[in-house]
Amino acid sequence: MNARINAEEIIRSIEAAHMKSDLPEIHVGDQVRVGVRIQEGGKERVQAFEGTVIAMRHSGCNRTITVRKIFQGIGVERVFLVHSPRIDSIQVLRRGKVRRAKLFYLRNRVGKATRIKAKTDSKEETL
C-alpha cells in the first residue's frame, strides 16, 4: 500500500514539471483563440484557431479541449492537448453560459442556432 502511494506521488511530481502555469481558466461554452506552433518547411510560425470549447477531457497534464468553429459553411473541430509544447497561447475571448458538460448537440445545428449566450459576472451586476 505504501509503495502505491509513493508511485502516485512520483507520477504527480513528473506531471507537475510538464504542466503550464500561465493558462487561463477554461470552461465548456467559452469562445477561445488557441495559438498553435506549426512548422512549414524550415520556418516555424503560430497559427490561430478560434472557436467554441465543446468538450473537456482528462485532467492534469493530459487535459484536452475540443474546439469547434464553422469555416466556409463546414464545421471544423480540433482536439488540443492543453499542456502541449506545441500550444503557444490560449486566450478566452468570451465566457459562455451553458448547462452541459459536453456540447455535442451543436454539431447538428446550423447558423444562428449554434450561438451561446454570454455569461455575465454577478459581481458586476451588484455594483
UniProtKB/Swiss-Prot annotation:
Annotated S-S bridges: none
One Pfam family recorded for the sequence: Ribosomal_L19
Gene Ontology CC annotation, any one: cytosolic large ribosomal subunit
Presence of the UniProt keyword Repeat in the record: no
KW Ribonucleoprotein (keyword) present: yes
GO BP terms, alphabetized: translation
GO MF annotation: an example: structural constituent of ribosome
Purpose of the protein: This protein is located at the 30S-50S ribosomal subunit interface and may play a role in the structure and function of the aminoacyl-tRNA binding site.
Protein name: Large ribosomal subunit protein bL19
Originating species: Synechococcus sp. (strain JA-3-3Ab)
